[in-house]
From Swiss-Prot:
CDD domains: MTAN. GO terms for molecular function: adenosylhomocysteine nucleosidase activity; methylthioadenosine nucleosidase activity. This is 5'-methylthioadenosine/S-adenosylhomocysteine nucleosidase. One of its GO terms (cellular component) is cytosol. One of its GO terms (biological process) is L-methionine salvage from S-adenosylmethionine.
Amino acid sequence: MIGIIGAMEEEVTILKNKLTQLSEISVAHVKFYTGILKDREVVITQSGIGKVNAAISTTLLINKFKPDIIINTGSAGALDESLNVGDVLISDDVKYHDADATAFGYEYGQIPQMPVAFQSSKPLIEKVSQVVQQQQLTAKVGLIVSGDSFIGSVEQRQKIKKAFPNAMAVEMEATAIAQTCYQFNVPFVVVRAVSDLANGEAEISFEAFLEKAAVSSSQTVEALVSQL
C-alpha cells in the first residue's frame, strides 16, 4: 500500500480521479480515498493546511492503512532563485523553519529530542530522480522547510534564507508528515512543484499557478507509483 498526502483539494484531485476501484471513508473528519493507481494499491488523503492537520492525517493514515511508504505531494514556494513555477521539488531533508529551542542547546528548526532534520528515503529519492529524467522535467533535490505561515513577503523569505541558506523551498506540511513517518518508521519522500517564488507577489502567483504546480507534482507522483 502506498500512502499519498496532499494538503489542498487541487493537490489531490488529479490523482484521486485516476483511481480505479475507488472507495472513500472518513475518519475524524479526514477523508481517505483508496483504489488502484498504475496497478498499485494506494490511499490518498487531503490533510488540510498546516502542520497539525498534516500530522493528524498522517497518523490516521498509518494506523488505518499501514502503508509501506508515504509520498507528500502538492505545491511549494521557491527559495532557490534558479527555480521556476512548475519545477519539481524532491526532498532529501526537511526541517521546520518556525521551531526555536535554541535556549536548550538545540539547533534552530529542531524539535527537542528529535533529529535536526528528517531524511527522506534514499531509494525513493533515486526513484523520483529517475522519473523526472524520463519525463524530461526540471527538478531539484534538496532541503524543504515547513512552517505554519504562508510566505508571501520579501522579509519573510529573507528571514528563512538567513536561517537556512541551503533551503530550496518552503511550504506548510512536509516536515510534520516527515516527523510522523519518522516516529512510525515509515519511509517517505516529498514530491512537490513550485507554485510561487515566496516573495511579495507570492499570493498572486500561488492563486494563478497552483493548478500548474498540481499537474506537475501529480504527474511525477503517478509516474513514481508506476515504478514502485
